[in-house]
Amino acid sequence: MKDKTLLMIPGPTPVPENVLLEMAKAPVPHRSSEFSAIFDEVNENLKWIFQTKNDVFIFASSGTGAMEAALSNLVNAGDKVLSLVIGNFGERWAKIAESHGAIAERLSVPYGEVINPADLKKRLDEDVNKEIKIVTL
């Protein structure tokens, strides 16, 4: 493979040559028993990787697409979302929440720092009416 650029970003990621060669083959039909068997095996392996007995979900999308799907199913217009912002992804959660009509409150720290758990606890304790529907990070 000629292009051996090392990408140090969230995505896209480098794809090994053997995977690229497999992708050049005809796809397995997604309604076939062969696909079902592969899908089940992948799900079981993901459970092992994540050390869980719970269901895992494969989402054919970018990370932002998964964030959109999560918030569109968890918040309604007018709901309050507390977004922990320590960088671009935390800010993205807030913007996506706002795009769905939610009210995004940001608990932010400068890039490279971390949110103090005591500050988060304090903010949640202040929410005596339980208006915050979800916390994003």
Per-range role (PLM):
Residues 1-2, 7, 31-32, 110, ...:
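Hydrophobic N-terminal alpha-helices or hydrophobic patches in metabolic proteins across all domains
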Residues 92-103, 110, 121-123:
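Active-site-proximal loop->helix
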Residues 49-50, 72-79, 124-131:
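Glycine-rich phosphate/diphosphate-binding loops that line cofactor/substrate pockets in enzymes
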Residues 4-60, 64:
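A glycine-/small-polar-enriched, mobile loop at the entrance of the PLP active site in fold-type I
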Residues 42, 46, 70, 120-124:
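Generic hydrophobic alpha-helical segments
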Residues 7-9, 57-60, 83, 106-107, ...:
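General beta-strand structural signal in soluble alpha/beta enzymes
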Residues 115-137:
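Active-site phosphate-binding strand-loop segment of PLP-dependent enzymes
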Residues 53-86, 90-94:
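Conserved beta-loop-alpha segment that forms the PLP phosphate-binding cup at the N-terminus of a helix
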